[in-house]
Swiss-Prot record:
Provenance organism: Arabidopsis thaliana (Mouse-ear cress)
Keyword set includes Metal-binding: no
Full protein name: Lysine histidine transporter-like 2
Subcellular location: Cell membrane
Ranges facing Cytoplasmic side: 1-32, 80-110, 244-264, 322-347, 397-406
Keywords in alphabetical order: Amino-acid transport, Cell membrane, Membrane, Transmembrane, Transmembrane helix, Transport
Length: 441
């Protein structure tokens, strides 16, 4: 009798383990600390770094420097919180952002708070990277082949997407490690090219640091959009628990030790990439800088072509880093809720449709600057700036008005302000860009 009761439980446990071994986030737990370093660099330093000089031109020196440094410090702190909370319950790992949300807010509420925002972030990033990859390929073509026939941006986005129709079928995080490492190296390379080439050019004649817009309302909206650009630049939190899930853990050596080592290295690289690009390029070009600094730098042609090639390689890796948790959510839903059997066919159809969807949306709205501002404020600010703090307050319950309590509430207030204000500027930028845009042009 006892045997017949335990058998279904054992079968369910075995089935659960088989599903976990198939899902992309939990299928491989043998990553080293340096895997977390380059995964985090790839996730964090993305297309956002290219827009930072433009954000500075809308913010101005005082607010710009303050917001850049404050964002770096706040997001470094909230990332530390995420790493600490991964194994805060003995014997349990929160492998996904929404699992931590469920622990903090409850089973249903946690899902409703975290999953929509995380999906908006990850799908939003992949759409922006489709645009970035396609436009960078077009820029390379236009630079190296001035006499060639003009090829529509639509086709370049489709060419970029074709790479992901192949790479999307790599099973898990560890299987994309080489792609991620190459992407991390590329991000450091093109960031260095951007500010070093600017220094070589010297300060732009008649450089102007005054407001870009001629009207007060224009300046206000540009300022709000710039807040979103900065928020977009710090987006790694949305995949940090999923990255940490790939690191082995024992009671003697929990995963947070290796993960934190990787995060510190990643954040040093982030500072090396972000601050010189933002401050040096703005100092050189002032308010004449484009929303993508590589579009401003037109000579030497060969170097700018190489930098754009580096961008393409980097956003290939970044796309996959942000797509993997989406694949995990989709496959978990299909296997656990819809009761599909785990199979290559299911994975192939799901992932192919996802790549096709992000490609189609990117073709429809390829507005780099506006997309950054809108997504940056609407979803990046909550998941990066203040959701970790709210979870920390709910779970850890620090002493009221103590240092930890005050720091967390400061981060929450800053994050909420970003969430409210930044999408307004981003949406306006998209609307203005759309006025002169023809679909599939």
């Amino acid at each position: 009798m006892e045997k017949s009761q335990s058998s279904p439980t054992k079968d369910a446990s075995t089935k659960q383990k088989n599903v976990d071994d198939w899902l992309p986030i939990t299928s491989s737990r043998n990553a080293k600390w340096w895997y977390s370093a380059f995964h985090n660099v790839t996730a964090m330093v993305g297309a956002g770094v290219l827009s930072l000089p433009y954000a500075m031109s809308n913010l101005g020196w005082g607010p710009g420097v303050t917001i850049m440094i404050m964002s770096w410090l706040i997001t470094f702190y909230t990332l530390w919180q995420m790493v600490q909370m991964h194994e805060m319950v003995p014997g349990k790992r929160f492998d996904r952002y929404h699992e931590l949300g469920q622990h903090a807010f409850g089973e249903k509420l946690g899902l409703w708070i975290v999953v929509p925002q995380q999906l908006i972030v990850e799908v939003g990033v992949d759409i922006v990277y489709m645009v970035t990859g396609g436009k960078s390929l077009k820029k390379i073509h236009d630079l190296l082949c001035t006499d060639c026939k003009n090829i529509r941006t639509t086709y370049w986005i489709m060419i970029f997407a074709s790479i992901h129709f192949v790479l999307a079928h790599l099973p898990n995080f560890n299987s994309i490690s080489i792609v991620s490492l190459a992407a991390a190296v590329m991000s450091l390379s093109y960031s260095t090219i951007a500010w070093a080439t600017s220094v070589k050019k010297g300060v732009h004649p008649n450089v102007d640091y005054s407001s870009r817009a001629s009207t007060t309302s224009g300046n206000v909206f540009n300022f709000l959009n710039a807040l979103g650009d900065v928020a977009f630049a710090y987006a790694g939190h949305n995949v940090v628990l999923e990255i940490q899930a790939t690191i082995p853990s024992t009671p003697e050596k929990p995963s947070k030790i290796a993960m934190w080592k990787g995060v510190v290295v990643a954040y040093i690289v982030v500072a090396i990439c972000y601050f010189p690009v933002a401050f040096v390029c703005y100092y050189i070009f002032g308010n004449s800088v484009d929303d993508n600094i590589l579009m401003t730098l037109e000579k030497p042609i060969w170097l700018i072509a190489i930098a754009n090639a580096f961008v393409v390689v980097h956003v290939i890796g970044s796309y996959q880093i942000y797509a993997m948790p989406v694949f995990d959510m989709l496959e978990t839903f299909l296997v656990k809720k819809m009761m599909f059997a785990p199979s290559f066919k299911l994975r192939f159809i799901t992932r192919t449709l996802y790549v096709a969807f992000t490609m189609f949306v990117a073709i429809c709205i390829p507005f780099f600057g506006g997309l950054l501002g809108f997504f940056g404020g609407f979803a990046f600010a909550p998941t990066t700036y203040y959701l970790p703090c709210i979870m920390w307050l709910c779970i850890k319950k620090p002493k009221k008005y103590g240092l930890s309590w005050c720091i967390n509430w400061f981060c929450i207030v800053v994050g909420v302000i970003l969430t409210i204000l930044a999408p307004i500027g981003g949406l306006r930028t998209i609307i203005i860009s759309a006025k002169n845009y023809e679909f599939f042009s």
